[in-house]
Every structure is written in structure tokens, then in C-alpha cells.
Amino acid sequence: MSSSLMRRVGSLAASAIIFPGIAHAASNYKLKESWEGEKILNHFHFFDNADPTNGFVTYVNQSYAESAGLVKTTDSGSLYLGVDYENVLTVDGPGRESVRIESNEYYDQGLYVVDIQHMPGSICGTWPAFWTVGPDWPTDGEIDIIEGVNKHDANKIVLHTSDTCDVGGGYKMTGDMTSSECGEASGTIGCVVQGKQGSSGDPFNEQGGGVYAMEWQEKYLKIWYFPRSSIPESLTAGTPDVSSFGTPMAHLQGSCNFKERFTHQKLILDTTFCGDWAGGVFGDSGCPVSDPSDPMLSCKNYVAENPAVYKNAYWELNSIKIYQLGGTAEVEGTQSAAAESTAAEATAAETTAAATQTANGGSIEEITTSTHSVTRTKTVSATHSTETAAVTETAAATTAAASVASEVDATNTQPVSKTKSTSYVTSTTTLCPVESSQAAATESVSRTKTTSYVTITTTLCPVESLQTANAVPSAKASTDAAAATTPAAEPHPSNAETPADSKSSADAVTAQATKTTIAVNTPNPATDSASSVPPDSIVYTAPEVTSSSSVPLFTIVSSSSQFVTVPTAAPSSFEPTDAVRDGADSYSTAASPTTPSNPVFTGVGSKVSISASVAIAAFVMLLLVN
């Protein structure tokens, strides 16, 4: 967890302690979906394929259902979903027409509330159900919230899962558990809880219908049934409080992880006839049996020959609502709470000014870039009477190079201001120190005079002082040609976050201002291919740097992406020397641009060794002074 996130969490916790009102019901269910009457169909589609449960039914599409009167809006505004109750059928022909609707979306854990004015009555041959199922059965699970067959008058709640899942934990419920194994190991039975009489069929309708509520969480699943006269006030008000719901009809919790066994459920409502369940137990339900040896055939005969009995085999829905956890309810009374969070994407306004100066035939470009950025601003405020507690956190944006300006302590844990201005001075030629272990180390260089290709990368080094830096010192040459070293301060580690989609201002500066100075001679493939280390007698030149800005100088290190601070000091003065030597043993300082594939200097070393003649070193320092 990031430090900024921990501070935000801590701030919220502190506010909750100081002002208890803002901690009010942080786990309350908040409304996610609300569909009423005919608008329910805006979120469902009609299933018109063969019945997966082998029912004696013909599911029709929406246009046909509407023209046939199987789907309509009632005078009260509720949604009617019925079946054909006019046509006599033949057993060998298509089954009775009906509708099956399925939600367009899949849903996960939450509180599901369906207000039902009427459900299919207790009629032989019927199998109505309101249920959910995942895209991969039984892996994603199935929850039968309302289900009954034939002359049902008590709802049966059934769960189906993969593998084994025992829910016989003895949890308190008003229903009776008749099977505790939900897994496919038990076949297609599933775990079953049978509700009290009056929870479905004709008795349900005689009470004016009611509300079913299902709470689906990681560790358990609870289902309540509320008759029309006993619906909890919190449900009516749209702010459900499950703690006031009382004992559920079913409390299913057991050996399996419900979070894994039930995922991505779509809602389904249908009415089929006969099928595997209703047809299989047709003779056990007190229904007329025409063929004692074949209860399924007896069911089909009854359904085909008695259309009028199915006039009451319809659903009438008032609403379907889905609530989910995660919101904070509004607090009423003398205490009030407000929480606002703003997350601004990294914004940067850059201005660049360039000036060119000429001295001793050389030129230098001074480019100053000012970057202002504000990111990840989080504000949490709470009001209690006339007192106010506010916590504001601002994280300054950083570049992709993980740069830290010298004026800001990267380890500072105090909130910073909303804006931060960082100035960069580029095109500063200097010799950055390198690690002795780096590939470009100069302590053990070859003295082969025939090696003539070397790349000197102009980089930008940070200066700790905020005052004007008129020059950047180079490595001091030793008179005995021994290695000279220039210590470098270690950079402060950066704890600031870099926005994923924000462009690095450091990259932009480097692209515009980085130059290279090359010492060239006839390349020797034999020596060049053997080592990328330059000889120790190369003349390193640097153009004059004149800065009137009170901003730090930086070195942008391409390979290590870190900033290295170079101490400020006045360079020594030397008399100018001849910059060009000719002949087989000579080097030329004629510069030409190049783009090295492997940068020579990384900017993270502790020292660098350069062996050169006194005259050459004097020439270098003279150029720096000028």
C-alpha cells in the first residue's frame, strides 16, 4: 500500500473518531439498479430456444409475445408475463407457448429485491421459477430464488455448484433444509430449503403477493420472503437494512467458498410445463394421472388438453432492484458529513526560453524549462456543527526519469503545495563520474593510440546550490598522468509516484538539448570491436556555460535515469594550447554529432580517472573558464 493511500485511510479513520456521525453505516447497501413495470424489459431479452429442462413448452420472442398478449403492461403499471391459455394442443406437437426472459447483464454479490404482485398459481403441470445462473454451469453456480412445481404452495430454494459443497451447518432459518449437498456430486438435486406454506402459488397470490430479498455475500447466502403486509420499512424507503429483516427463510453457508462457487449471475424468469422436475413428480402431487407407468406423458396430456386452467399461470412484477455495498449513506440531524475526492490527471505547463551565446568561436544554448504539475489530489473534509476537519494531500508529479529537484527533499513526509516549479538548464557540457564497475570505466583503459573512435555524451548534472552556477568543473588532470577523481554526491531517492500516462518533461528536455563531442580518427575495427573503453589521452572539451538564472544545473543521465549532484567550484586557469595534433600518434578534437548506441557515462559512479598531458588538461580548463 502506498504511503499516500495509508495517509488517506488514516485521515478517514481519525475523522470517524473525532466526528462519529461520518462513520454512519459505511456498509449500507446503495441502489445500483432499479427497474419498474414495463421498464424491466429494457434490461432483459427474450429466450426463444428449446427448453434446457426438457419442458413441454414453446418459448416465444418478444414481438410474438406482445402480439399474442403474453406480455403487457397492466392498468396499475406492473409487468404481466403470461402463457397461452386458449389453445388445445397435441402431445406430439409443440408445447404450450410461454415466455422466458434473461437479464442483459451479469451481476455479482449484492442484495437483490423483487416485488411480485402475482406468480403462477398452484396448477398441475407448471414449473415457474425466478433464478440466477452463471455463464458456465455448474462452475459459476445457480441460485433458484423462487421455484415450485405442480400444486406448489411453499417455495423451494435450491443451489447448484460444481464439485461438492455442503451447507448443512445448522444456521437459523425459517425454512426446512431437505438436502444439504449443493454440488454436482448429488446429481441435479442440489441443496434444498423448503419455505413455509403460503410462500408461493395460490396462497402467495391471495395475500396480494410480496417481496423476496436475496443477500449474496462471500461467505453466505440468505433469502427472505415478506408478505405484502410485512415488508420492512427500510425496503419500502429504498434504504435496506438487513439487520432488521429478521430470520431468513434460508441461510446457506458451509464447506465451500461462495465467492468462488457463485460468480457472474444473470437473472432469469420463466414458466415451463412438465419437464424433468414437474413431469417427473407429476403423479406425486395429486395431479390426474392418465398413464400410471409414465408420469411425464401424463403431465403432457394434461397440459395439452386443459388450456383454461393456465389462465392464472402468469407473473406480475412491480419492480426489481439491485443493491451493492460500498457507499456511505447521507447523515441527517445536527451532524453532517461531506466527503469529496478529486483525482486530477497529471497536468503540465512548460515554457522554454533559449538563448545563444558565442565565445571563442564556440556556442552554447541555454534552455530553461519550467514545469508546473499537480497530481493525485485527495481532499477529505468533515463538518460537525461549527468545527471543520480537513485533510488535504497533494502529490507532486515527477517525470518518467524519477527526477527529484534539489530544492525538494524526496523523503519529506509533509504535504507539499499544489504546484511545484522545477527549472532545468540544459546543454551543459561536463564530465560525469562513473562507477569503476561500469562498462565505460576509464581507470583501466587501453593506451593504444590506434583506437580512434570514442563517444563523449553531453549530459546534465544537478547542482545542489540554488545560487547561480557559472561553470561546471571538469576532472583535474594529474601531472604524473595518474588517474584523477571527482567525487559525486549520491542522489536523493525519489518516493514520488509517476503518472502512467503523463509525459516526462525530462525526456523532452534531453531530446532537445543533449549534445555529444567526439574525438575522431581513422577507426580500427580490430581494437574497436574488442573494447568500447576510450584511450586515456583523449581531450575532453566543454563549451562555455554562463547562467544568470538562480536555478540549479542538472545532468540527465540516460542509462541510469538518476540525477547526480556535482559540487560547484571555480575551475583552475591554464594557458591555451594547440588543440590539434597531426600525425599517426595524434588526435583531433574536431567535433561532429553522433547518437551512441551505448552511452559512455551513466552518471552514478563514485569516481573517474582521466590521464592526459598537462598541456591537454590546461586546454580543457581554459575552455571551461572562458
From Swiss-Prot:
Its main location: membrane. GO terms for cellular component: plasma membrane; side of membrane. Residues 604-626 form a propeptide. Residues 33-286 form the GH16 domain. PROSITE patterns: GH16_2 (PS51762). Its EC number is 3.2.1.6. Gene3D superfamilies: 2.60.120.200. The keyword Repressor does not apply. SUPFAM superfamilies: Concanavalin A-like lectins/glucanases (SSF49899). GO terms for biological process: cellulose catabolic process; glucan catabolic process. Residues 477-494 have a biased composition (Low complexity). Glycans are attached at residue 61. Residues 477-533 are annotated as: Disordered. A lipid is attached at residue 603 (GPI-anchor amidated glycine). Belongs to the glycosyl hydrolase 16 family. Mixed-linked glucanase involved in the degradation of complex natural cellulosic substrates. Active on laminarin. lichenan, soluble carboxymethyl cellulose but not on pustulan. This is Endo-1,3(4)-beta-glucanase xgeA. It comes from Emericella nidulans (strain FGSC A4 / ATCC 38163 / CBS 112.46 / NRRL 194 / M139). The gene is xgeA.
